[in-house]
Structure formats: C-alpha cells, structure tokens
From Swiss-Prot:
Residues holding ATP: 8-15
Keyword tags: ATP-binding, Magnesium, Nucleotide-binding, Transferase, tRNA processing
Protein name, as recorded: tRNA dimethylallyltransferase
Gene3D superfamilies documented for this protein: 1.10.20.140, P-loop containing nucleotide triphosphate hydrolases
Ranges for region Interaction with substrate tRNA: 33-36
Record carries keyword Ribosomal protein: no
Essential cofactor(s): Mg(2+)
Reaction catalysis annotation: adenosine(37) in tRNA + dimethylallyl diphosphate = N(6)-dimethylallyladenosine(37) in tRNA + diphosphate
Annotated InterPro entries: Dimethylallyltransferase, IPT, P-loop_NTPase
GO molecular function: ATP binding; tRNA dimethylallyltransferase activity
Amino acid sequence: MPLVAVAGPTGSGKSELALLIAEKFHGEIVNCDSLQVYRHFDIGTAKLPLGERRGIPHHLIDIIDPNELFTAGEYARIARNTIADISARGRLPILAGGTGFYLRALLDGLFEGPARDQPLRDRLTAREARRAGSLHRILRRLDSVSAAKIHANDVPKVTRALEVCLLTQRPVSELFARGRDSLRGYRTLKLGLLPDREVLYPRLDARCAWMFENGLVDEVRAILALGFAAECKPFESHGYKQALQHIRGELNLREAIFYAQRNTRNYAKRQITWFRREPELVWLKDFGNAPEIRETAMDRVAKFLGQ
C-alpha cells in the first residue's frame, strides 16, 4: 500500500504541499507534529484552521489535553491504525509534520522499554536541577549514539534514555536496534522540504512576531484559565514558553518575541539536521508553495503511484 510523507523544518510549507497532494491524489492528511496533537494550542503550533483545510480530512490533531502524557510510541500506534483505515477506504494517507522522532517511530517502530521508575527519575531530575547538562554528559558516557541524537536541552528524553540505560544495563541505541517493529505492508515516498536558510529564518522571525501580535499571549491566558498548569509539556515549546514568561512578568513583549524567534530558528536547524539523516528522503529545495516544488512533488507522487 502507498504512503506519502511530507517532512521538513517548521515554516517550510509542509501543510500547503500536503493539501495539494491530497487534493490531486484523493488523500487524507495524518498529522506528524508533536504539538498539534494537543487541544487548545493553536496559534503557536500553526495549526491549520478548519476553514483552510479545503475539505480534506485531517487526522491526529486535537486528540489529547495539554496535561496528558503522550509518547512517540502512542503516536505510532494511533497513526498506524489511522493509516490502515484511510488505505482501507481507498484513499492515500499523507503524513505531514516536522517531528522526525514521530515519523521514525511510525515507520521504523520503537522498542518496548522498561516501565518508568519514579524514584530513579526523581534522583535524575534532582541531579539535573543541581547542575544543568549533567544528565546529558552521563548519557554520552553510557550511550554516545543516543546522546548524539538527543539535544542536551531536551531533558525529558535525556532522562528517559538514562532511565532505560540504568534499568536494563544496556545502551538505548542497542535496545532500539534489536526491538523495533517496523511498519509492514506499506511502501513510503518521503518528501523533504529544504528552503534556503537565508530565506527561511527571516520568515520564521516574521511568523513569530505575527503570532504574538495576533493572540498568542491571550491564547496562553485562556489555556491557563481552563485549569491547565503552566508545567504542562506543550508550554515548554518555543513561543508558548516565552508567552508564559511574558505573562509572569519575566520578559517584556519585545524580549519574548526575540527569544521565541531565536528558539524557533534553532529548532528549525535541529529539524534539518535530523531529516538529513532520514534514509531515502527526497529533498525539495524550496518552500512547499513554490511553483516548481509543487510540480516536482506532483510528478514524484504520480510516478510513485504508477500514474
């Protein structure tokens, strides 16, 4: 069965290209963004409004509350079921999003790691609180392969990797290679958008500013008013973190926008680095709405489908 994935850094036009593919090839879109799964987080995640989806079904958007734990493994399980349902109805499933780890979990599978050990997690958390970056340094010694793939600032992932290492006495990378359950029955065309950074970064800066000017801070206030704690995971993401700091009086509006822009650019850089390691990804070196990219993508998909 055919499966198409549209990947790339934030702001590269994945949603628009996925829509065009879906319209031409009778497809449905499956979200592959780790923030768009959360309800209420709309502006800062660039979630496509219902009125702009052009009648194309979108799946795995707004499926959990901000205070719920949601792992890549859970995403892979739900996404696989969704893809199977779309295919069974004779439609083309199209993955769209920039969370490379979700895409990897879906296509290649994840190993079933040990259950969470809260006392161990508490000790690791306390150590990181005493000295920032200490957990990542330990992970580099125990599992350099995993440490190279996980950013030092992504403390939850670093903590989980260390937890698994310590509980199993094996590197996570080794366990992952042994125990993966890859997606079966599908052949996948992976398209990766790669605009020039000198063009992408200014656009990201402008988009961040637009979000703050068009209700991001009010959206955060509304989420807090619903009773969701500021410690919820999606509040750690770029844009939302700075909006929260602004509400607390820790940053003025100009500073909040500046740091959100900087963090968004850094995130885009990490996404590009991740997707460069993605096997068999076809790079399209511009934005998803560029005419030549549209044409190339449509040709690629048509050939992939044998049309």
